[in-house]
From Swiss-Prot:
Coiled coil: none
Tissue expression: Central nervous system.
Single GO cellular component term: growth cone
Protein name: Protein phosphatase inhibitor 2
Record keyword Metal-binding present: no
Location of region: Disordered: 1-44, 104-142, 163-205
Amino acid sequence: MAASTASHRPIKGILKNKTSTTSSVVASAEQPRRTVEEELSKKSQKWDEMNILATYHPADKDYGLMKIDEPDTPYHNMIGDDEDVCSDSEGNEVMTPEILAKKLAAAEGSEPKFRTREQESSGEEDNDLSPEEREKKRQFEMKRKLHYNEGLNIKLARQLISKDLHDDDEDEEMSETADADSMNIEESNQGSTAGDHLQHKSQSS
């Protein structure tokens, strides 16, 4: 029986039949005509903007930005002892070359206070260290000094190399001139012996 009902059904194709289009036209004619506004409201979408803001822009969202929690770069103010060398109150005066030379001469012998503090604090830290740690720290400081002076060492090495090359060039030039002089002397000696030999032949004949 199931087979007989399946065989009686019409096979539906992909394309619309003419009868199906006419039936939809009849059905639409039966429905009351809607206004244009209802048609537009049916097709358009309404956005819930507050929901969009809450979804995509929550208050606690950080947008991948980092907050850096570290102290500002320290600024070392001039200590009270350095007021005679450099003073902000003297900034109002006209700076002449003589005054500048005096200030530079006065500041040349003194070391900045923050460096002396660092040296004092490093001396206090050495007392707390064991002998192995002191030796390790001393070696580290020595290697650090060598590393930071490496640029100066390279510059000096380049100067020495260029000086050696220049000296080698001068030595080669001197040896070449000495060789040329010895060759000239030998040629003149050979020429004079040949001349003597010719004179001797002419006298004997």
